[in-house]
Amino acid sequence: IIGLVSKRLFNERMISRKDEEIQAVQHGIDYMGYKVKRKMPLVWLFIDEAHEFLPHESVGKTPATDALVQVLREGRQPGISVVLATQQPGKIHTDAMTQSDIVISHRVTAEPDVKALNQITQSYLYDSISDKVNNLPRLKGSAILLDDNSERIYPMRVRPRFTWHGGEAPMAIPKSDDTD
């Protein structure tokens, strides 16, 4: 289903983008000041557990792989933004990593995940990404943000979750207020 939805979104946005460009060109001289009337809105596609739909090339393909890779490579021009989440960057398709403008990574320790992060090290970075991740403070929520547009890497901290979390690890001993 993800492959079909991705392909359809891509095709629809390409058609819409062409119409938007024709509208803008027809307005000629006031091109920069012309506000395009969109028939289809710009799209954000969010995919959790992305390695399940975009596995590393060495593993093979899923029915969604080709459509998602096309969106990753060509989707920016027609107005499609993609947000992928995975806890295993070593298992995700190489294009998902190399086509990313922003990468947020918490501390990773598995060797394939560290290697995957180091593969996206850009020429403007003096240290490897794994060095940056390893130098993070050992606090919950610590992460790095790699911004390809500003060509910088930023340390960051994600605030604690305030809502119920279905994926939380079970506790053998119930947590009481006085054990915080």
Model segments located where?
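P-loop NTPase motor domains
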Residues: 1-70, 137-147
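Conserved ATP-driven motor cores of ASCE-family P-loop NTPases powering translocation/secretion/packaging/pilus
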Residues: 69-155
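Short, surface-exposed linear patches
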Residues: 8-12, 66-70, 105-108, 125-129, ...
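Residue-identity detector for glycine
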Residues: 3, 28, 33, 60, ...
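Short secondary-structure boundary/capping segments
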Residues: 60-63, 98-101, 120-121, 160-162
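Sequence-level detector for tyrosine residue identity
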Residues: 15, 31-34, 124-126, 154, ...
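Conserved P-loop NTPase motor module
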Residues: 138-180
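Short clusters of small/polar residues that mark proteolytic maturation junctions
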Residues: 57-58, 107, 157-158
